[in-house]
Amino acid sequence: MYLSAERLAHANQAVKEAFGQCSVAWQAIPHWDTGDPGQLNVANGLLGGSAGFLSLGPPPSPPPPPTPTFQLTVAELIAPTPDALLTAVMAATKTLANFFDTDVLKQCFAAAPSPTNTLTFASTNAQDIQNSLIAARVLVENAGYRAPSCLITNTVGLQVLNQLVSGYYNIAEQILAAANINSLYRFEPLDGTAQTRVRMVLIGRRRRIGQGAAPDASPGEEPVDVAFSALPSLEVDGETSTGTIQFSPRVRYAARITDATGLVALKA
């Protein structure tokens, strides 16, 4: 109605690409499409008495950030080039990806069983960081996840991993190798704190998944995956009271923690 089919397809592709480039959870956690955009619930992937269902929905948008919508004039929409549309799409999609990551990664951090899979660093010196990450490696390997793991850390944690020993030697590569970690991401918040202290979550792997390669991985074998009933796309909301047209990038999903023993939360 407001956009040609070609331009709407172009905008939808921009949402998908921008979401994939901006979202840590999209890059680090395998996902799958339920195939039904109207689906409301999905199996949680657990067995026995723990089997149940999860609701599929958009990510929560905690105040004060508003829901990621944008408005454009008709003139901007029918312009010879889609520059205004694509600029607005990418800005709103970045916000949507942040809400998505906050929701999914907080769930991963909180799902690590306590006290067995919740580790506290004795200190933030190089040896203690390495010892704790090796201990996390042992936990996920004992749970059956022997492929190289994925580590997601906040900014303080990234600084600690990259501390200089003797004033010039960066230890990150050696620590990650010792802990059998082949992919590293930075995101915050990972829990409800102010993120002034180290927070990390280690995700075990059954199959080798490279940096940013989770979208191509099989989700059923990993300790966490994300089910989507609506993949990243653009919703045309309609005309506003000021005569502009409102659009919303959207996703509908549920994060499924299918085996919490494959997750380890680390903090200082």
Give the residues covered by each predicted segment.
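Flexible, glycine/threonine- and acidic-rich loop/arm segments that mediate assembly and lattice contacts
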Residues: 1-102, 237-268
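Short, surface-exposed loop and linker segments with low hydrophobicity and enrichment for Pro/Ser/Thr
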Residues: 3, 16-22, 133-150, 156, ...
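Intrinsically disordered, low-complexity boundary segments flanking structured domains
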Residues: 13-15, 54-59, 136-140, 170-173, ...
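Extended, solvent-exposed, turn-rich assembly/linker loops in the middle of proteins
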Residues: 112-178
